[in-house]
Structure formats: C-alpha cells, structure tokens
Amino acid sequence: MAKQKFERTKPHVNIGTIGHIDHGKTTLTAAITKVLHDAYPDLNPFTPFDQIDKAPEEKARGITISIAHVEYQTDTRHYAHVDCPGHADYIKNMITGAAQMDGAILVVSATDGPMPQTKEHVLLARQVGVPYIVVALNKADMVDDEEILELVELEVRELLSSYEFPGDDVPVVRVSALKALEGDKEWGAKLLELMAAVDESIPEPQRDIDRPFLMPIEDVFTITGRGTVVTGRVERGIVKVNETVEIVGIKPETTSTTVTGVEMFRKLLDEGRAGDNVGLLLRGIKREDVERGQVIVKPKSITPHTVFEARVYILNKDEGGRHTPFFKNYRPQFYFRTTDVTGVVTLPEGTEMVMPGDNTEMTVELIQPIAMEEGLRFAIREGGRTVGAGQVTKVLK
C-alpha cells in the first residue's frame, strides 16, 4: 500500500461501543484498532485490550467517569471512539455527554442475544440523542446454527424498532472480535466490513459552526464611553459586528439588541465563532439589563422555558452525592450552562422515591425561565455540590 500522510481534511466523527456487560465491547474496540492498523499501518496505532480496559477517570459536570478514548482512521474518515469499562460509567457518560457520540456500535453477543443492559443502552441512546446505531453481532464464531444467528439478528432489529430506531434498515454485521484480535484473516475482514458500515450509515455531524449562534453569558461589565460588554465562550454558530441578537432567559421578557463590537484578547474582530472566548459590546443595553445565566442568540433561534421532562443520573454517596433518597417536590438547583436555577421535581407515575445511584426520568418546573431546547444538559446541585446530572428530553412549557 502506498504511504498516506495524515490528512486533516478527513471528516471527524465521534463514536462509541454500547451494549451488555461481557458481550465484547472492549475486545471489539481493541480488535478494530488492530484490523485498521493492519490495513493502514501509517494511519493507525494498535491499542491493546488492557490499555482500553484500564480507562482513565474524567470529570464531567462534577461527576467522575471512567472513559477510554482511542482514535483510528478508515480510508475516508477519522474517528474518536469511546469505550467505558463499567455499566454505570456508560449511563453517566451518556447522560452527562462527557464524550458526545455521533453514532454508536451496539455490541450484542450472538450466544446471548439482547440482554437487560442492551435495552437500557438503546433506550438511553434514544433519549440522549445518539442518532445512529450499527450492530456488531459478536462471538458469531461460537454459533454454528445459521437459524440461531438469524433469530438473534431479528430480536436486535425488533428491539431497535421498539425504541424508534430504524430496526429494519440498521446494518447488522456478524463479527468475532476475539478471533480478529488473534489475527484470524476472515474475521478481520468482517471487522473491515463493520467499519465500512459505520462509514456508510453514520453521517457526518453538523459542525457547531454551522448551527445558529448561541453564547452563554459568563460576565457583564461597563466600559465607560462605550457601553455594556458581555463575555463568554461562543457555544455554536458565528456572531458578526452589526448583527441583531436576542438576550434570552432568567428574565420574563426577551431583549433584542445589536452587537456593535466583538473583542478577543483585547483585539477587535469582525466576528466571533464557535469555541472563541469573546466580549460582545451591546448597543443600548444597561449593565443591569443582562446577567450571567442568560444567553445571547441569533433572533428566534431559542426560547425561554420553565417546565421540562428530563433523564437524570443521581450520584451515589461514594461519588460525593446524597446519602438519602429524595421524593416528589424535591427542590434542588439546576445548573444550566453558567447558572443555578431552583426547580421543583415531579417523579414519574409509580416512582415513590429516587435512590442515590439511580437513573430516572422526571419533570421539573423552574422558578425562572432558561433558554432551552431538547438535548440541553444540566447538573443538579445542592448548595454548590453536584448531586446529579441530566438532559432535557422534552420541553413542556
């Protein structure tokens, strides 16, 4: 094969392995790196199993999670792949979005079929917005009976359909991660087939820069003779000088204003883009008209809300969370982007209480409106200490 130099122009996609314990997620992750290393040695280092298995700890929204990150390239793409050692780590990662996934490889053992955690991961993927799934039917070398393989495949497709994924169309590839890792050529080829399916059916994500402008306000100050400046990190989109923007959230009404200047590191710019830390000079706005916790956005792109449904993970006491359960009408603070807002919790029908370490659905009513859309993530705090994390699954009011 001709030498290829690393092309930064390749599209970048974030994926991860999900599925039941011991169905082979970590083995598959290692095997993918091996097979791609063998196919494109200049592009891919091989990452052995034990290196992925002892995943380093990270913090996301005050929650500690073990996540292993590996990267590799196919012919057409560059991938960042996440794998979590424990079931709880998966749940925490998916809810906090510590490692965002543009798509997932659902690993199902052909010897067991879908198991309880298979279902839980698929449900979470649906709720937290993992948009695409490809199935690796693993340990296929251990099943001689073609009919059994077909039945398991059917079961997986039905499971995906029941959670509103396109079960009939999702690629299902029969693999043996262990055999591929051991260097078996035929099973290695099946993994290349799996990655071709990932290339093909997990589309490129829309880049932050292409989405409507949004910047959470971190600080507000006055520059004598020039006006009010708000600072923050642009979360998405682009803001240009002389554009009209809206200030949304916290206060009952949304305010419209014009950006008369964009500054970064004391220099004047024409625009601020996703990822930039900038100061925006706003026309006709008084210091007391804006506050931390509001967002500056492209007009009409987002609205303020107080009532929503969410999927949450509640820390256990070893993670620094609560020592006792909570009940309906629990009133913690919900930390959105840059600020805390108190909210009242309603639990789902039939749920009396939520124990530390649980993940659950809930409805929340905030005492102040927040610029909100489905998919927005938050932390749950009591007096500045994180006790949980969640994601808005549905805006109600």
UniProtKB/Swiss-Prot annotation:
Subcellular location as annotated: Cytoplasm
Keywords, ordered alphabetically: Cytoplasm, Elongation factor, GTP-binding, Hydrolase, Magnesium, Metal-binding, Nucleotide-binding, Protein biosynthesis
Organism superkingdom: Bacteria
Region of interest (G2), ranges: 62-66
UniProt-annotated stretches for the region G3: 83-86
InterPro entries named among the record's database cross-references: EF-Tu_GTP-bd (IPR041709), EF-Tu_GTPase (IPR050055), EFTu-like_2 (IPR004161), EFTU_2 (IPR033720), G_TR_CS (IPR031157), P-loop_NTPase (IPR027417), Small_GTP-bd (IPR005225), T_Tr_GTP-bd_dom (IPR000795)
UniProt region (G4), positions on chain: 138-141
Record domain tr-type G: where: 10-206
Region (G1): 19-26
Any single GO CC term annotated in Swiss-Prot or TrEMBL for this entry: cytosol
Positions of region (G5): 176-178
Residue positions binding GTP: 19-26, 83-87, 138-141
GO function terms (MF aspect): GTP binding; GTPase activity; translation elongation factor activity
Keyword flag Magnesium: yes
Alphabetized Pfam families for the sequence: GTP_EFTU, GTP_EFTU_D2, GTP_EFTU_D3
EC number(s) from the headed UniProt entry: 3.6.5.3
Positions that bind Mg(2+): 26
Catalytic activity reported: GTP + H2O = GDP + phosphate + H(+)
Function in brief: GTP hydrolase that promotes the GTP-dependent binding of aminoacyl-tRNA to the A-site of ribosomes during protein biosynthesis.
PANTHER family the UniProt entry points to: ELONGATION FACTOR TU, MITOCHONDRIAL, ELONGATION FACTOR TU-RELATED
Family indicated by similarity: Belongs to the TRAFAC class translation factor GTPase superfamily. Classic translation factor GTPase family. EF-Tu/EF-1A subfamily.
Quaternary organization: Monomer.
Protein name, as recorded: Elongation factor Tu
Species annotation: Frankia casuarinae (strain DSM 45818 / CECT 9043 / HFP020203 / CcI3)
Species classification: Bacteria, Bacillati, Actinomycetota, Actinomycetes, Frankiales
